[in-house]
Amino acid sequence: MNVKIEGRRKIRAKVAIPSDKSISHRSIMIGSLARGTTEIENFLFAEDCLSTINCFKKLGAEIEIKNDKVIVKGKNYSLSVPQQVLDCGNSGTTTRLLLGILSTQEFEAVLDGDSSLRKRPMKRVTQPLSQMGASFEFLEKEDCLPIKVKGKKNLKPIDYTLPVSSAQVKSALIFAALKAEGKSVIKELPMSRDHTELMLKSAGADIATCFENGFYKIEVMPSNLEALKIKVPSDISSAAFFIVLALICEDSEVIIENCILNPTRTGIIDILKQMGADIEIGNVEIQNGELVGTIVARSSNLKGVVVDKNDIPRIIDEIPILAVAAAFADGKTIIDNASELRVKESDRIKTTLEMLRNFGAECYELENGLEIVGSRDNLKAGIVNSYNDHRIAMAASILACAVEGESTILNAECASISFPNFYEILLGHSKKV
């Protein structure tokens, strides 16, 4: 599906943002591994999260939808042998966290995914899990899906420092460590998003976290999990597209309610404020251990910034849309130390730069990042290939709304991976000036 967008738009609206993808994934996983029945309200019915549901159904979890809630009857970490390959679709979260979970099960299972997921590296997860006693076989290409996993009942505890901060790798190790024979210690620098730790603590897991010698340290003891009642807040990674839309379009304001404000996820807000963005946060409260609140963003004159390397894990999913904001800012923006972008759904350094250049932006590739010389006057309508990367498709669409003329986004249907009704909301709420 290709989408044409007529530019010079503005938006003044309260926007309903989809539920958080990270928490939706983990709610299914924790519910499936817990004792009792977990109820999930506001679940994100997007392709990635549906892949997680389908995989856990194949592993014996009873999952049904009742009155707009997802009901999960837990298996108490005793999953069933799957009779089919576990198809993870496009979801790296599903794959990598499942590798940790399946490491605790005394059976073999095969994980596979689509052509994009098959290119993403998996040894970063399998190597530490192998140290704990699980076995892995790459069936076609080294380091890539499909993978055969053979778990073990009594895994060895691990003391492991992540070479690169990653919520997915960290979470896989935590899920495995819950069934190890003693205390495991996992460290990372800087700290990545901590939804797994918070949600598992809520479910009764014996997990302690602290900062030690600059590192974020997690201690995990063997634990059973209890069922939860979860209300999933709105996803700040999805909200970021409409926040930036309001900032770069004239006479615009966006209000987003019940949005997750976990400090490990709000890097995009902090950096946009450094750039001069008019953003207000209000109505802050705690739900299931997570900060949530209302975000209001208004048209702003932005300036370029140098992004601190310690903020990269907090904005790793938002870098394409941050780059769009940078293209409209006065001056130079540098985003570096972001090698993780190379192994996302696309090489997001290359695809983000190509997107910006197709709209006329001046930008340069760094070894592990981007340099963007902002100038609203240089920007014009363009044609952009999404490379089937949902965040590239949506970032390009936001940029298209703020420039003169008609732009075309190729293969735009991939937005549904995380934001099923993105174009309906974007074109419904924004109007031609």
UniProtKB/Swiss-Prot annotation:
Keywords from the UniProt entry: Amino-acid biosynthesis, Aromatic amino acid biosynthesis, Cytoplasm, Transferase
PANTHER family referenced in this protein's UniProt entry, alphabetically: AROM/DEHYDROQUINATE SYNTHASE, PENTAFUNCTIONAL AROM POLYPEPTIDE
Name recorded for this polypeptide: 3-phosphoshikimate 1-carboxyvinyltransferase
One GO term (biological process): aromatic amino acid family biosynthetic process
Pathway(s) annotated for this protein in UniProt: Metabolic intermediate biosynthesis; chorismate biosynthesis; chorismate from D-erythrose 4-phosphate and phosphoenolpyruvate: step 6/7
Covalent S-S links between cysteines: none
Entry similarity comment: Belongs to the EPSP synthase family.
PROSITE patterns per record: EPSP_SYNTHASE_1 (PS00104), EPSP_SYNTHASE_2 (PS00885)
Gene it is expressed from: aroA
Organism: Caldicellulosiruptor saccharolyticus (strain ATCC 43494 / DSM 8903 / Tp8T 6331)
